[in-house]
């Protein structure tokens, strides 16, 4: 792992070297000129999927951090700087690395950057993470098919592993769970650990699960996904084992 500074930019890479193109790696235009953009997804901004296996060992997802809500209308992507390790991209990078090393199915963090403004008070942030191949988010799949009991139980066990590490996923919802098709069957992954972190005690774990259930119920009405109380019972049964 290598952390370094170039002018008003700070980088961390999951490699023991410095890259001359460090700045360009976080610019969509660079990858477009290289003809290495292989897809994209829209959220608050655009996440670009990049062909980088020959450079980084895996293909990557490039994401810029944007604010949501009312603040996002006034200030779309600047955050107040206090310490490097607590910036949005560096904090998510380190949390992903911790979970990855613990064996949880999360994207491997590849690199993160922050760029300070002229006064050094605010910063903008970006992150590069592993792209999970041959995968769809849960809501996309549930619009066209039901899932077997074992898949719901796998999701429950995954969330339990996360909670056993005292990590609270503050945006735990059906869109942040991916299902990957492998030769061994379906594998569940968790995404988007921005603003997530360690939390003491246990009271929040039930609240976290309830948040996930509400997201499923919301998408039943909004996207007509196939989700039942029995699915939830299978998930929570595995969680409590």
Curated annotation (Swiss-Prot):
GO terms for cellular component: plasma membrane. The active site is at 171. It is an enzyme of class 2 (transferase). Transmembrane segments: none annotated. Its main location: membrane. GO terms for molecular function: ATP binding; kinase activity; phosphotransferase activity, alcohol group as acceptor. It catalyses: an alpha-Kdo-(2->6)-lipid IVA + ATP = a 4-O-phospho-alpha-Kdo-(2->6)-lipid IVA + ADP + H(+). Pathway: Bacterial outer membrane biogenesis; LPS core biosynthesis. It comes from the Bacteria. GO terms for biological process: lipopolysaccharide core region biosynthetic process. Keywords: ATP-binding, Cell inner membrane, Cell membrane, Kinase, Lipopolysaccharide biosynthesis, Membrane, Nucleotide-binding, Transferase. It is found in: Cell inner membrane. Its EC number is 2.7.1.166. It is a peripheral membrane protein. Optimum pH is 7.5. It holds the Pfam family Kdo. SUPFAM superfamilies: Protein kinase-like (PK-like) (SSF56112). Catalyzes the ATP-dependent phosphorylation of the 3-deoxy-D-manno-octulosonic acid (Kdo) residue in Kdo-lipid IV(A) at the 4-OH position. To a lesser extent, can use GTP instead of ATP as substrate. Belongs to the protein kinase superfamily. KdkA/RfaP family. This is 3-deoxy-D-manno-octulosonic acid kinase. It comes from Haemophilus influenzae (strain ATCC 51907 / DSM 11121 / KW20 / Rd). The gene is kdkA.
